[in-house]
């Protein structure tokens, strides 16, 4: 049975961290079934609908993956002068590296399309026009000063429209210093949560940006709450999502992906991380769990608060969620308010989960009464919200080397982002042998208290338009600095 969680809210600047436990995550398999001919173990209500293998490309000259909208500080998605605008991690499919090597070459780019057109009336690929790279060449690399590097990449974050036309882009500046492309690290990779500001412009024909020349380093891992590259070459520190909380007016917060501070593989997992009741017949032995290698999986969701009104100075707070001996990646976290509740959504991979637990690539979610809560994992305590169809009896494989016994859509979508109204966008990774690098069809998830379900009446069989990322409010000038875009 899952660990009891109360949803109780705590002071955001307090030190309570909700533990996503092994007892919680093991509910995924407990609530699943033996896969039949469909090669899917998951309940249908939690399964991403099958994406056709003949999917269209958003743009044949750009690989696209993590994507986020132009938004305000309350995550309303804004149209600007009649245009919808999105930002994506992009790479060049013609540059000679493979799709799986794209991460060290990632640049943030943008796309735009006219607002207010139903998906059914748009081109099959969503109708987005490629606007180009957002930042001037080399601007991101300057935050690293004289540190040696062979590659600089721009990783995910969030875009906030403030004060009319100002766009603050919070993102992850990364650098790599390797002996050869794909080779060994000479020095550990670096990741710095960074902000750059520019201005959006639009006329009746297109959208463009100016600025983004100056990049300000905001946060680097401290080694205490959040693991550093010196502690673990495989550390995670990325994906800033910046927001305001109506319960704490005047404050601006950021959630991000981290790992628990300390040396990689340290035997620091506790009985509380396992989370079993004393009489649970499925209770595991702590030493056996740590001996299994689960000590290498220690994800967390971090929290920071701005300490000045300009949002250029930030301080770490303790993480709001830990997944010690459970999972190693809780990517692209976001806070989502609905019906007075605070939902924490994040994404993860089957291959980053600890030995002895299992779950699909997809979205995981938790609900509480504040941004720091004893979050209750959704859907029977497991946390699973939306997973790719997966056969738990077959090995995971990899997007570039799929197991023949596995569901061919195990890697069909990833990097999901939950939008207003329960819409969820993502990108296509691999469907059978065909690789993606383009936006997936949007789906809709009904969110009701502690449970969610895919709406299969949405679109066609549950699949909406490819890359359908609609604005829910127009940008109306003043007010974006506090998120009140009314």
Locate each region found by the language model.
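Carbohydrate-active catalytic/glycan-binding domains of CAZyme proteins
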Residues: 1-486
């Amino acid at each position: 049975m899952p660990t009891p969680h109360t949803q109780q809210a705590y002071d955001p600047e307090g030190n309570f961290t909700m533990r996503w436990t092994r007892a919680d995550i093991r509910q995924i398999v407990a609530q699943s079934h033996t896969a039949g001919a469909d090669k899917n173990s998951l309940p249908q209500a939690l399964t991403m609908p099958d994406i056709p293998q003949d999917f269209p490309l958003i743009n044949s000259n750009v690989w696209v993956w993590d994507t986020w909208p132009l938004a305000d500080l309350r995550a309303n998605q804004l149209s600007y002068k009649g245009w919808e605008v999105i930002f994506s991690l992009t790479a060049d499919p013609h540059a000679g590296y493979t799709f799986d090597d794209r991460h060290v070459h990632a640049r943030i780019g943008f796309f735009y399309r006219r607002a207010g057109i139903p998906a059914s009336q748009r081109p099959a690929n969503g109708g987005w026009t490629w606007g180009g790279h957002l930042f001037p060449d080399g601007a991101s690399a300057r935050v690293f000063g004289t540190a040696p590097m062979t590659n600089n990449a721009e990783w995910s974050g969030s875009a906030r429209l403030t004060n009319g036309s100002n766009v603050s882009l919070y993102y992850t500046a990364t650098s790599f210093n390797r002996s050869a492309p794909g080779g060994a690290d000479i020095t550990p990779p670096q990741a710095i949560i960074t902000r750059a500001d520019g201005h959006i412009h639009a006329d009746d024909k297109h959208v463009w940006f100016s600025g983004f020349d100056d990049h300000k380093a905001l946060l680097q891992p401290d080694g205490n709450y959040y693991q550093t590259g010196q502690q673990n070459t495989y550390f995670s520190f990325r994906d800033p999502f910046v927001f305001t909380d109506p319960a704490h007016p005047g404050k601006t917060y950021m959630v991000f992906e981290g790992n628990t501070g300390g040396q990689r593989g340290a035997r620091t997992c506790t009985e509380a991380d396992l989370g079993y009741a004393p009489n649970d017949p499925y209770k595991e032995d702590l030493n056996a769990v740590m001996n299994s290698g689960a000590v290498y999986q220690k994800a967390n969701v971090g929290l920071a608060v701005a300490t000045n009104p300009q949002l250029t100075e930030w301080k770490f707070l303790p993480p709001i969620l830990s997944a010690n001996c459970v999972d190693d990646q809780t990517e692209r976290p976001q806070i989502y308010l609905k019906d007075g509740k605070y939902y924490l959504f994040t994404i993860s991979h089957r291959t980053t989960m600890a030995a002895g637990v299992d779950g699909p690539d997809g979205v995981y979610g938790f609900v509480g009464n504040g941004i720091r809560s004893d979050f209750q994992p959704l859907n029977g305590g497991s946390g699973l919200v939306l997973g790719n169809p997966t056969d738990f009896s077959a090995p995971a494989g990899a997007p570039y080397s799929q197991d023949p016994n596995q569901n061919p859509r195990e890697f069909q979508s990833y990097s999901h982002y939950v939008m207003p109204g329960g819409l969820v966008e993502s990108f296509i990774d691999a469907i059978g042998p065909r690789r993606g690098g383009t936006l997936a069809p949007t789906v809709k998830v009904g969110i009701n208290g502690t449970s969610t379900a895919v709406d299969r009446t949405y679109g066609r069989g549950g699949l909406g338009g490819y890359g359908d990322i609609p604005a829910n409010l127009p940008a109306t000038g003043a007010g974006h600095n506090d998120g009140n875009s009314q």
